[in-house]
């Protein structure tokens, strides 16, 4: 069989706008529900959600029949962990808190086989090779793998141009929450200096010929970042959407109850 294509990587190269959603429930059932909704991509979070390699595998299998592409965020840029994630079939990998070009180069090496990298060969044990059903996987795997590095600290912003220019880095993703916190604004990315840092990072990424993405659940933020040149934007978080919908639903009934209690008693006998 042929090596599965990576439509997300191809779309990034065509500079298409891609709208995504954060997936934090860490269950295949929830991931599959999200995959039916039509988002271009979903971020399966291995950093802040309670995921492990087996739970990530289950979610990859659950969403495989659908068009929504799974991007998996590792908990950290560990070479051994990256090997495991690629072996279970991750094609698009996001790594948090990348601050230097050297870090980015090491991540590229972790995703490639020798002599261009250090990825170990799992052969017929791995889902990525479809258990040895994909011929020449070792030689061609890099063609369909996509590496996204996260810039989410002042140090990362300072080195954004060098990071984005690293060969093998396909895209940069900005983390506004960590960036703003690192700049002394406790998660408030609306502050002027944080916005300027985001803009500079987008510009540096585009100047290197790479795609830039960001998390922006608020529509006005998402549209502004798109105007600046971001092409893949996460516009929602599944856990937040569930909580907001649950609160809004209950609020309608609480409001009705309060209105009923405030109404005068009927004088009709």
From Swiss-Prot:
One GO molecular-function entry: metal ion binding
Marked site (Transition state stabilizer) residue numbers: 73
Chain sites annotated for binding a divalent metal cation: 152, 178
Top EC class for this record: lyase
GO CC annotation terms, alphabetical: cytoplasm
Keyword terms: Lyase, Metal-binding, Pyruvate
Positions of the catalytic residues: 48 (proton acceptor)
Protein name per UniProt: Hydroxypyruvate/pyruvate aldolase
């Amino acid at each position: 069989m042929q090596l599965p294509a990576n439509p997300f990587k191809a779309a990034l190269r065509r500079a298409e706008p891609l709208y995504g959603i954060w997936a934090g429930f860490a269950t295949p059932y929830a991931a599959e529900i999200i995959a039916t909704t039509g988002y271009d991509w979903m971020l399966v979070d291995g950093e802040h959600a309670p995921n492990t390699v087996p739970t990530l595998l289950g979610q990859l299998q659950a969403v495989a029949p659908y068009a929504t592409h799974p991007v998996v965020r590792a908990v950290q840029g560990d070479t051994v962990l990256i090997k495991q994630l690629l072996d279970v079939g991750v094609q698009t990998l996001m790594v948090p808190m990348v601050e230097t070009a050297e870090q980015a180069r090491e991540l590229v090496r972790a995703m490639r086989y020798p002599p261009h990298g250090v990825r170990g060969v799992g052969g017929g044990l791995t889902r990525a090779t479809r258990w040895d059903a994909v011929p020449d996987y070792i030689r061609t795997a890099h063609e369909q793998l996509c590496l996204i590095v996260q810039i989410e600290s002042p140090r990362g912003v300072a080195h954004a141009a060098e990071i984005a220019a690293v060969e093998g880095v396909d895209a940069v993703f900005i983390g506004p929450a960590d960036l703003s916190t690192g700049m002394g604004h406790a998660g408030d990315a609306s502050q002027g200096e944080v916005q300027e840092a985001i803009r500079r990072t987008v510009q540096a990424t585009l100047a290197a010929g790479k795609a830039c993405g960001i998390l922006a659940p608020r529509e006005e933020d998402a549209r502004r970042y798109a105007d600046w040149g971001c092409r893949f934007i996460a516009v929602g978080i599944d856990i937040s959407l569930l909580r907001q919908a649950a609160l809004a639903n209950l609020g309608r009934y609480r409001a009705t109850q309060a209105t009923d209690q405030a109404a005068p008693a009927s004088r009709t006998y």
